[in-house]
Amino acid sequence: MGLPVHNQPHKAHSGSPASTFSAALVSSAISNVIGYPLDSIKVRQQTYNFPTIRSCFQNAVKNEGLKGLYRGLTLPLISATLSRSVSFTVYDSLKLTFAHVDPTLRYFISGLGTGTFISLFACPFEYSKLYSQIDMLLRKTNMGRRQETNSKLSVRPPLSSFQSASDIVRRYGFTALWNGYRYHLTRDALGSACYFTIYETFKKNLIANDVKPHFAYAFSGAFCGALSWILVFPVDTAKSIVQRNTLLSIKTPLSSIPWLSFTIYRGIGISLMRSALINSCNFTLFELFRETKVLSK
């Protein structure tokens, strides 16, 4: 985020909105390409009963090949990259607006507002991504209900993320792209609030204790990504279940979601790996670009 650390020997560069946006754009694109296969495995574990990360990975590779783990990358990459760029820019602006507030509360409020704003635009992209990622599994489920053979799976090739969005609109209507939005909103608002607060606090304390800035960025990014994800993971699982069931024409009452069951955390292992990796990479690159102003030249 390139936020200033007051009264410390190391000075972070806050920069202009344009420099914030461009630095976040490039760093987010790189980190999301690196972490996408882990996200694909996470979604499969959340929506179908794979007992381990290994079994989920083996199933995906066996049925779809390694490229299957990158299926649906285009649309969420655009979404994640743009939303991260906008969110960092919005966050910096909100932080200035609440400059008179206690630092920790300022980080939390600014993150909360950022997540709320971004969720409105990110939901259709994420829903299309989920649709694309579990398309093969959905067809197996539907064919099993109709007692059809798996050989018919080869009739239609897997959908891309753009094809998924088009298919959702064609079959369910334009507003269907926001199915499960209340869960998405809750996840993004609370997640962003925790995310930015944890990152800012840890980064500031590490640098204050003479930790090298780049290590502070990497560690704080990994830690904020993992911890904030643990806090909102049940909501993310509920979102995936609701969206999957909508595609299967199954109603999902709030009481039917296993909030107090360990199954709500299915896929948490791969999610923590992904979140730590992506955010460590993202914040390190972001802060580096902001400090060197390499993208402004």
UniProtKB/Swiss-Prot annotation:
Check the record and name the PROSITE patterns matching this protein: SOLCAR
- List the transmembrane segments: 18-38, 72-91, 107-127, 184-204, 215-235, 264-285
Which domain of life, per UniProt?
A: Eukaryota
Record Pfam families: Mito_carr
* Gene Ontology terms describing biological process: mitochondrial L-ornithine transmembrane transport
Please name the SUPFAM superfamilies in this protein's record.
Mitochondrial carrier
Q: What keywords were assigned to this record?
A: Membrane, Mitochondrion, Mitochondrion inner membrane, Repeat, Transmembrane, Transmembrane helix, Transport
- Give the bilayer topology: Multi-pass membrane protein
Which coarse location class describes where this protein primarily resides? mitochondrion
Compartments where located: Mitochondrion inner membrane
InterPro entries attached to this UniProt entry: Mitochondrial_Carrier (IPR050567), Mitochondrial_sb/sol_carrier (IPR018108), Mt_carrier_dom_sf (IPR023395)
- Gene3D superfamilies registered for this protein in UniProt: Mitochondrial carrier domain
Q: Name one GO cellular component term.
A: mitochondrial inner membrane
- Give one GO term, molecular function aspect: transmembrane transporter activity
Which stretches are Solcar repeats? 15-97, 102-205, 212-292
Give the function comment from the record.
Required for arginine biosynthesis. Transports ornithine synthesized from glutamate in the mitochondrial matrix to the cytosol, where it is converted to arginine.
Which family does the record assign? Answer: Belongs to the mitochondrial carrier (TC 2.A.29) family.
What is the protein's given name?
Mitochondrial ornithine transporter 1
Organism of this sequence? Schizosaccharomyces pombe (strain 972 / ATCC 24843)
